[in-house]
Amino acid sequence: MHWHPQRVKHGFEGTLLDESGRVEDENFTSDYRQWFQTKAPGKNPDATGIGWNDHTASIYKLPENLHPTYWTGEMACELISNYDPTNKPLFLKVSFARPHSPYDPPQRYLDMYEDALIPDPAIGDWCGKYAKKLNPEKTAQDAPYGNFGNEYARNSRRHYYANITFIDEQIGRIIQTLKEKDMYNDALIVFISDHGDMMGDHYHWRKTYPYEGSTHVPYIVKWPSVDHVTPGKTDAPVELRDILPTFLDAADVTIPTDMDGRSLLPLAKGMETTWRKYLDLEHATCYSDDNYWCALTDGKIKYIWRIHTGTEELFDLTQDPQELHNAVNDKKYRKQLTEMRNEMIRHLSERGEEFVKDGRLVVKEKTMLYGPNYPGKENKR
């Protein structure tokens, strides 16, 4: 999803699309919406009235087998059931639009969390300015920042968790279908997400932020039985760019030397290997002028550089996993701050003097909001 043109295949033999209403127009109707109208003619697939960037919540108004989460799981199961594994290997990408908003689970999944202890948002000692809605163009329910109260946040979280459980059930159906086709043991399965959701932490909502709620994602790999990988967990900083090299390595295909990312197979097998020290994170301007940042983290410490304002943030994730305290002015973290700042200087220096000049990070007054080839948009701050 989110490709342009929507039907471009990028190496796949075919696609079935659910764009959650984002780009539906007279020239494009997603496969899900076409299917929906055959199953529920005249009904509104957006009957909850919640937008795809809203953080309010409501139960799904229609039978759950009409929900896009169910449709995605059903299409995957049908494809696997009808696939001939003796023909050639199957590469299948199953992308659930949820738990991205709208937070709209069917009632029975929400009921599972009726008595659950839902945590309040984490509120740091640094985020007071975000308590007020900073973007007057946004309505209350899609404001990127704001203090909407703990009860509101817990309600949104309850629906968010329920949507995750809904997805979990669909993944179970897919795994069962693979087993019925005798394809499971030899399958390489990766469960990931492209981003998280702040869910009110530090008065932030949605994504695009350098904080854990937005950037920290699930990353679960089920290896083929032939790889003889012992189940376990790694603390090495891994990222989404590692997926393609991992696929190539597992298929015994040579990984191009200029490819971003690293194969996870050596880590999974416990082999000695040099690994990256930090993950580099970055997002261009979004929601507010100061939300253009670069960050480095090894999972234990995180340094954030805000390019438009020249402000820094430092979080000790070992002692402060919820990022409640910005340690940038703490004397006891002075050494770590200097080390991380120097790492950022080294990281950005290859981009030239617009980012690093005379050994110092540069505050940039103007940046591109969109890339030069982004369809229908002009380059602007």
Language-model segment annotations:
Residues 144-155, 327-381:
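Long, internal low-complexity/basic segments
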Residues 102-105, 176-230, 239:
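Histidine-centered active-site microenvironments of extracellular/periplasmic hydrolases
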Residues 33-34, 43, 212-215, 281-329, ...:
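C-terminal, low-complexity/hydrophilic appendages and adjacent surface loops
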Residues 70-84, 120, 145-187, 250:
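A long, amphipathic alpha-helix that forms part
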Residues 1-63:
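Catalytic-site neighborhoods of secreted/periplasmic enzymes
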Residues 78-124, 140-155, 198:
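Active-site His/acidic residue clusters
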Residues 65, 129-130, 154-165, 209-217, ...:
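A short beta-strand-to-alpha-helix junction
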Residues 5-6, 58-61, 65-74, 90, ...:
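Polar, surface-exposed loop/tail segments
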